[in-house]
Amino acid sequence: DEIYEQPNSRYTAEFIGSVNLFSGKIDKDEKDFVTIVCPALPDPIYVAHGVTGFEGMDVAFALRPEKIKLTKDEPDMPHNKAHGSIEDIAYFGSHSVYHVRLDGGMKLLCHFANRRRWDSEGFTWNDKVWVSWGDLEGVVLTS
């Protein structure tokens, strides 16, 4: 599971399971956090640990589809969120895959366990939604 959760390259991240890859540049790299500017997002990605890099360095941020939260209302968090709309939904019995087109143009895959019977916040095609993720949910890739 370490290769899946902590891939060391874009190739490994894409080879082992589904992944959303954000291309960007390091904005700040401190001991306890790094921020990454990504053209597809309105605000920098915030990661709650530093990396070995430098400002302006090209990196990728790998985020697994099951690590993303999907809501209709804007999350009460200062970073790691974006607005978009649901373009497609694939139902697989135990889970569904949502294809969300961000306002910046990038498409994300989001996986969720099916819980229709007790979930009051159901989603459907063309819904306007917010995607968000925690500060430690993704991996910064330098190669």
Predicted regions and their residues:
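Short acidic-hydrophobic catalytic motif
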Residues: 1-5, 13-16
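Non-catalytic connector elements of ABC transporters
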Residues: 19-21, 28-143
